[in-house]
C-alpha cells in the first residue's frame, strides 16, 4: 500500500463551472497532492479526481469518501480549483497500492495479467491500459504457439516485463513531480513554464504511441527465443 489516496467523483455538466469546462485533461498540482478534471460522455459530465498523501496508516480498498477529508488536504488550494472539490455530492475513495517490478508472474499453467502481475500507482493512468495490452499480447502468444500454454505464457511474460516495469517506475516518478515541494517544486515549475504542448507529447510518445501492432511485434520478437 503506497499511502497515496485517490478520490473520484462525477459531476453533471449543468453543475460544472463555465470557466472550467475545458475540453482537455487539466491538472492542478501542489505539495503532496494534486487535482485532475476532464470531460466525459462528450462533455455531458466531468470527472473530478484528487490525490493526496494520507496521514493515516492505509489499508488497500475502496470505500465511500467525505468532502471534509478532501478539504483537509487541500486547505491552501486556490479558490478556482477549490470550487471543484465542493461540487460532488458523493465521493469514492481508493487507497492505492503498487509493488516492485518482477521478472516472473507465470507459474506452470497459471499466469497473471494487469494489476495482478504489475500493480501501479495512478499517476500515469495506465492500470487498465496495461491490462488490455497484456490481453492482446497473451492472445497473440496463444495464437502463434497453437495454444501451447507453456510456450505462450513464456512468450507473453517476456514480451511484457520491461514495458510494464517501466510504467510502474515512471508512475512513481510522475507522482514525485506532481507532488513536489520546496526547491523541487521551483525546479519543476521552471522546467514546465512555457514548454510547448508538443514537447510534452513527444516525451510521452513511448507510452501513448503504443498500439496493437506493438503488442503483436513483441510476440514475434520473442517467439524464436522460446524452446
Residue ranges and their predicted role:
Residues 6, 69, 73, 134-137, ...:
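Alpha-helical elements of Rossmann-like donor-binding domains used by nucleotide-donor carbohydrate transfer enzymes
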Residues 69-76, 80, 151-166, 210:
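A non-catalytic, amphipathic alpha-helix used as a structural packing/dimerization or gating element
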Residues 193-227:
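C-terminal auxiliary extensions adjacent to catalytic cores
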Amino acid at each position: 500500500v503506497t499511502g497515496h489516496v485517490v478520490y473520484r467523483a462525477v459531476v453533471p455538466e449543468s453543475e460544472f463551472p463555465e470557466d472550467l469546462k475545458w475540453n482537455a485533461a487539466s491538472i492542478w498540482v501542489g505539495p503532496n497532492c494534486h487535482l485532475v478534471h476532464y470531460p466525459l460522455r462528450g462533455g455531458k459530465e466531468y470527472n473530478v479526481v484528487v490525490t493526496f498523501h494520507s496521514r493515516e496508516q492505509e489499508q488497500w480498498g475502496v470505500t465511500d469518501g467525505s468532502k471534509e477529508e478532501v478539504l483537509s488536504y487541500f486547505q491552501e488550494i486556490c479558490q478556482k480549483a477549490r470550487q471543484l472539490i465542493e461540487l460532488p455530492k458523493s465521493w469514492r475513495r481508493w487507497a492505492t497500492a503498487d509493488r516492485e517490478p518482477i521478472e516472473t508472474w507465470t507459474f506452470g499453467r497459471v499466469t497473471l495479467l494487469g494489476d495482478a502481475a504489475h500493480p501501479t500507482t495512478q499517476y500515469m493512468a495506465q492500470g487498465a491500459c496495461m491490462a488490455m495490452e497484456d490481453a492482446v499480447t497473451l492472445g497473440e502468444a496463444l495464437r502463434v504457439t497453437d495454444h501451447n500454454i507453456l510456450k505462450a505464457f513464456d512468450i507473453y511474460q517476456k514480451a511484457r516485463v520491461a514495458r510494464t516495469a517501466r510504467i510502474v517506475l515512471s508512475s512513481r516518478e510522475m507522482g514525485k513531480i506532481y507532488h513536489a515541494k520546496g526547491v523541487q517544486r521551483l525546479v519543476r515549475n521552471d522546467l514546465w513554464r512555457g514548454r510547448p504542448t508538443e514537447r510534452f507529447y513527444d516525451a510521452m510518445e513511448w507510452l501513448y504511441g503504443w498500439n496493437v501492432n506493438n503488442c503483436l511485434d513483441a510476440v514475434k520478437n520473442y517467439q524464436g527465443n522460446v524452446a
